[in-house]
A protein has these predicted regions:
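Conserved functional hotspot residues or short segments at active or partner-binding sites
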Residues: 288-290, 294-501
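Cleft-lining beta-strand/loop regions that shape enzyme active-site pockets
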Residues: 3, 7-34, 39-265, 286, ...
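Amphipathic, alpha-helical segments enriched in basic
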Residues: 48-50, 204, 208, 270, ...
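A generic structural signal for well-ordered coil/turn residues at beta-strand boundaries
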Residues: 2, 85-87, 119, 276-283, ...
Length: 505
């Protein structure tokens, strides 16, 4: 899109910059940073429009515009000690590439005894994105995942984990294409409309980009298209599903009906053009997996379930009012002979049980799972509380206890993190190019704009803070679920070499 390249958020009526997107016009200017507040917007040399208490979507419309045009922002710097300080920042609008929500990869070196490690590839996929409409320049999920698989394969990955834990869905066509990277031709999903008509969407490309061991890591937040991928790969006995006991359970398709367009004989069709359109979202179709079972409400159950706070939180489809019930249709008559195709399948004799038993043993013995269960117990106790004291003394003590507990958690995470696995990051070329451009921009000296500041603020201070921010590394997140998935994958890989799956920590 064309804009300034900043993530904005409404903070109690004030439009606040929460993130400067890499490689965008805002970063190029070197004059904006996170937590700066936008108080006014002006087009070119025109007067400023006051945007305090204005709805965020209207502010965004004012800031966006044609490529090459200038927008001026009246900024209250976030780091200014004096709240009366203002500065005027002119920015030339340009193209902004969103890379934060694209697929990413990493290679985990999992210890496997005798000073050996097993390289396990991980592809994190936040959504199913792709080209929408003519002239779209967006990349696609399948193309991006293909690029990462090739990079991980070249790096020596012996197994791949497809991380769909925070994937809420997206384009159905991309879900079908992505599944095809791991199976030869075959059904992916059945779609039935309200009249009972059924359509089978299949992968028709006989080639497979990855035929090695495959784990799909899911959670209660994995919904819609991600459930189709997980369910299809499970039905084809192609992947092992690991994560929460089941996925979200969204197996329906909705369409937004604009009432004045869809109901020509109602009074809605007489509404004037400038009036707000009346719309309704209606469920029109339902998904079914190749085996005929719906993903609605029940979701896709895990082959190996890991303990999680998500199990008792009301975040699934079955927790919503008036959710459609689960159902089933006839299964598609299809089977892949993985032995004949020489493709790794988790349904090899005794393999599934061996992997599950080894994981269960670790869940009962490892310190990180004991810590996880303690955390879940504390959160459940808090969730089950139905009454809160109105005593100020009790509330203060509660705050103190909570802070002490959170500090304890942080200390435990830090201690566990010291023994985390070695990981190497793999990015898409478009993301690498964007990061390189960002580093190049940040290495350039800041250009001062005469007369752009109202009040006292030092450009040298801004330069120093940008430099400190660029050098600051994110603290690694100790991901218990990903670690266990990598260990399960390691057991699987080693089982290909030995008659029994080993239990590696």
């Amino acid at each position: 899109f064309v804009g300034i390249g900043a993530l904005l958020e409404d903070d109690d009526g004030i439009c606040t910059i929460k993130e400067i997107l890499p490689g965008g016009p805002a970063e190029r200017s070197r004059l904006l940073k996170a937590e700066d507040q936008i108080l006014g917007v002006a087009q070119g040399g025109e007067e400023f429009d006051d945007v305090v208490d204005m709805q965020l979507r209207y502010i965004v419309r004012k800031i966006k515009g044609k490529k090459g045009t200038t927008v001026r922002l009246l900024i209250r710097p976030g780091e200014a000690a004096d709240p009366s300080v203002r500065k005027i920042v002119p920015i030339v609008r340009g193209e902004v590439k969103l890379t934060a929500n694209l697929a990413t990869g990493k290679l985990i070196s999992v210890p496997a005894g005798d000073n050996e490690t097993v390289p396990v590839g991980v592809i994190e996929l936040p959504s199913f994105y792709g080209n929408i409409g003519a002239g779209s320049t967006l990349t696609t999920t399948t193309d991006d995942v293909s690029e990462l698989i090739k990079k991980l394969n070249t790096a020596g990955a012996e197994g791949i984990i497809l991380d769909l834990r925070m994937n809420g869905g997206g384009l159905l066509s991309e879900a079908v294409r992505l599944t095809g990277l791991f199976i030869p031709i075959g059904p992916v999903v059945q779609v039935r409309d309200s009249s009972g008509r059924k359509e089978i969407l299949s992968d028709r490309d006989p080639s497979m980009l990855w035929d090695g061991p495959l784990i799909v890591l899911t959670s209660r937040f994995s919904a819609s298209a991600s459930e189709i991928v997980a369910g299809a790969l499970k039905d084809h006995a192609r992947a092992l599903i690991v994560g929460n006991s089941s996925t979200h359970g969204k197996g329906t398709v909705q369409e937004v009906y604009h009432m004045n367009n869809r109901m020509p004989f109602s009074f809605f069709s007489n509404i004037e053009k400038q009036a707000r359109t009346v719309a309704s979202k209606i469920t029109i179709k339902q998904f079914y997996l190749p085996d005929g079972s719906s993903t609605q409400v029940k979701g896709v159950p895990s082959d190996i379930a890991l303990p999680s706070v998500n199990e008792f939180l009301p975040i699934g489809e079955d927790d919503l009012p008036h959710a459609l019930p689960w159902g089933e249709v006839a299964a598609v008559d299809w089977i892949n002979d993985w032995v004949k195709l020489k493709v790794d399948s988790p349904e090899r004799p005794e393999l599934m049980a061996a992997l599950a038993d080894a994981s269960q043993a670790r869940q009962e013995s490892l310190e990180e799972f004991q810590f996880l269960r303690k955390q879940i117990k504390w959160r459940k106790k808090r969730y089950d509380e139905k009454a809160i004291s109105i005593s100020l003394e009790n509330r203060i003590q509660r705050k103190i206890n909570e802070k002490a507990y959170i500090d304890e958690l942080d200390d435990i995470y830090e201690a566990l993190g010291e023994n985390d696995y070695v990981m190497e990051e793999f990015l898409l070329k478009v993301t690498e190019d964007q990061d390189a451009l960002s580093k190049e921009i940040l290495s350039e000296p800041i250009k001062e704009i005469a007369g752009s500041t109202i009040g006292e603020i030092s450009t040298n201070t801004l330069s120093k803070e940008i430099e400190e921010t660029s050098e600051k590394e994110e603290e690694p997140v100790y991901d218990i679920y990903l670690r266990e998935s990598a260990r399960i994958m390691t057991d699987w890989v080693r089982a290909l070499e030995k008659p029994k799956a080993a239990n590696y920590l």
